[in-house]
Amino acid sequence: MAMMMRKAAAVPASSRRSVAVNSVSGKRTVSGKAGAPVPEDVLAYAKTLPGVTAPFDNVFDPAGFLATASVKDVRRWRESEITHGRVAMLAALGFIVGEQLQDFPLFFNFDGRVSGPAIYHFQQIGQGFWEPLLIAIGVAESYRVAVGWATPTGTGFNSLKDDYEPGDLGFDPLGLKPTDPEELKTLQTKELNNGRLAMIAIAAFVAQELVEQTEIFEHLVLRFEKEVILELEDVERDLGLPLTPLPDNLKAI
């Protein structure tokens, strides 16, 4: 026994490999740094997360971020994805609703100066709207940090708590959260996919309004009108009838 202890003491500390149990994945990993999982463990953990959806039945990682990531990185990225998805869903809905209700004085538009595409509403809305909004955002973000972040300040300030499920802030006023794990994972996947679609949608909304200078529904109606006229032209051409001219406002769409 004494001989074994002397041999162990003779091994340099720098060459010892530590065995750490990952608190998130529950797997035992061996690495040169305590708690650092090998890439296989990171990939295996990522495959267990909600959001793995057809046609990408495996983890969708074309840029290879997982190759150099840790489980902590993956958890932090998932938290960011959920947060950005939720904001994008609100933004996409806000674009459409804001453009339809901009004529209602109740919505901080007492003088009717808020009009046109939603990309210009930011500059048109008065200061009385932004101060309460910034306070509300600050309160919401402070609550999210308090619930989920392990170290709000200092090194690794945005690391998540080991027992925190990314995106789960305990906000469920309607009691919609399933108690069955599989049902919960399915619902989480739906939220992620809707958030991903919303992030693409809000980017498309902004690009479309910058190029076309028209509101979302207005563009949709004009596009439909143009398609009808073009189809009518084909019929008229086949029948030898005079062609219906395309209005100037539809030519650029």
UniProtKB/Swiss-Prot annotation:
Residues spanning the signal sequence: none
Spans traversing the lipid bilayer: 87-107, 131-151, 197-217
Binding site for chlorophyll a 2: H84
GO biological process entries: nonphotochemical quenching; photosynthesis, light harvesting in photosystem I; response to high light intensity; response to light stimulus; response to photooxidative stress
Keyword annotations of the record: Chlorophyll, Chloroplast, Chromophore, Magnesium, Membrane, Metal-binding, Photosynthesis, Photosystem I, Photosystem II, Plastid, Stress response, Thylakoid, Transit peptide, Transmembrane, Transmembrane helix
Membrane topology, from the record: Multi-pass membrane protein
One Pfam family linked to the record: Chloroa_b-bind
Protein name: Light-harvesting complex stress-related protein 1, chloroplastic
Subcellular location: Plastid, Chloroplast thylakoid membrane
Molecular function terms from GO: chlorophyll binding; metal ion binding
Positions of chlorophyll b 1 binding: Y45
Annotated binding of chlorophyll b 4, by residue: R144
PANTHER family the record matches: CHLOROPHYLL A/B BINDING PROTEIN
Functional note: Required for non-photochemical quenching (NPQ), a mechanism that converts and dissipates the harmful excess absorbed light energy into heat and protect the photosynthetic apparatus from photo-oxidative damage. Is able to sense luminal acidification of the thylakoid membranes, which occurs along with elevated electron flow caused by excess light, and to induce a large, fast, and reversible pH-dependent quenching in LHCII-containing membranes.
GO cellular component term of the entry, any: chloroplast thylakoid membrane
Positions that bind chlorophyll a 1: F60, E81, R196
Residues at which chlorophyll a 4 binds: N194
Domain of life: Eukaryota
